[in-house]
Regions:
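Catalytic-pocket segment enriched in acidic/His residues
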Residues: 51-53, 67-69, 73, 77, ...
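Short acidic-glycine loop/turn motifs at beta-strand connectors
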Residues: 7-8, 13-18, 150-152, 221-223, ...
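Glycine-enriched loop-and-adjacent helix/strand subsegments that border the catalytic/binding cleft
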Residues: 82-239
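N-terminal non-catalytic cap/leader segment that marks the start of a structured domain
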Residues: 1-109, 113, 282
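Glycine-centered flexibility motif
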Residues: 12, 45, 127, 154, ...
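Generic detector of intrinsically disordered, low-complexity, polar/charged segments
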Residues: 6-9, 42, 60, 86, ...
């Protein structure tokens, strides 16, 4: 099951290469639907998702409320998150090591998850330009990541139950201003300028999620592959991160968790290869499809 947010903010479903406008399909078939937006569907839960998916399949088979995926310019799956994006830092060992070389810190695997947040106003759609902000930074960098979306909230979640709290996953690009990151010590500002969280294009329900070993997280800059790692190479896996994040702190439906980036970021090269206006980034997470954004 793959869902997306259409240009008008309404709920869509991707059936093969066909996008179904769910509110329009519901109107044509004279049925009630549990949600008309993707954020609303996440709140409604798994049973609602299955009902929407069955409606999408019926509409696709009859060509109702249907468009070719190539003709759709989706928004971010959750265009206006209700809370800051929760992020894991240095969650792949090779990335921790490349950062250590540049920032004079330990390259050992963190003993505990490194957690920070990104502002909700950083979220932008696939295809939307990422500003280069030359007046604010000279060290603009990319970070390809798999992002989880929480479906069932909870506090003090047992690791064995963690996956049942996940609605699905998507791709996110954790754009970072490395000079601001160093200047301010805390990473929030360096990762929260407007446009610093491209996300999408689709949200894949966890029932359609491959095994972590079969998911690759990749990033290309101007067609050159810079990052590639399997999702099972995380230092802190999904059960561990959800358990820690929910320890004494309630997770809510719609919360977004950026799970960490692999090695290959621009700052890791010698000399560093930071982004410039005119560059194009493509984040490709298995099952989600390319998240493409230019830099302006």
């Amino acid at each position: 099951m793959k869902f997306l947010t259409l240009e008008n903010g309404q709920l869509g479903a991707l059936v093969d290469e066909t996008v179904i406008d769910i509110p329009e399909a519901a109107r044509v078939f004279s049925v009630d639907v549990p949600a008309t937006t993707l954020a609303g569907l996440v709140d409604a839960g798994d049973i609602a998702a299955q009902a929407i998916w069955e409606l999408a399949g019926k509409a696709a088979s009859q060509g109702v409320a249907a468009r070719a995926y190539s003709d759709v310019a989706p928004l971010a799956p959750i265009p206006e998150p209700r809370r800051n994006i929760l992020c894991l830092g240095k969650n792949y060992l090779e990335h921790a090591q490349e950062v250590a070389k540049k920032m004079d810190v330990s390259g050992k695997a963190p003993a505990k998850p490194i957690i920070f947040t990104k502002a909700t106003t950083a979220v932008i759609a696939p295809g939307q330009p990422v500003p280069s902000y030359p007046q604010h930074t000279r060290k603009l960098d990319y970070e390809a990541e798999l992002a989880l979306v929480i479906g069932t909230g909870g506090r003090d979640i047992d690791p064995d139950d963690a996956w049942s709290h996940v609605f699905g996953y998507t791709a996110i690009n954790d754009i970072s201003a490395r000079d601001l990151q160093k200047d301010h010590f805390q990473w929030f500002r360096a990762k929260s300028l407007d446009g610093f969280a491209p996300m999408g294009p689709v949200l894949v329900h966890r029932s359609a999620m491959p095994a972590p070993a079969d998911i690759e997280v990749k990033c290309y800059v101007n067609g050159e592959q810079r990052q590639c790692e399997r999702f099972d190479q995380l230092i802190f896996d999904v059960p561990a991160m959800i358990s820690v994040l929910s320890a004494g702190m309630t997770l809510l439906p719609g919360d977004i968790i950026a799970t960490g980036t692999p090695a290959g970021v621009g700052m890791g090269f010698s000399p560093p290869r930071y982004l410039q206006a005119g560059d194009e980034m493509v984040v490709d997470v298995t099952g989600v499809g390319p998240l493409r954004n230019p830099v302006t």
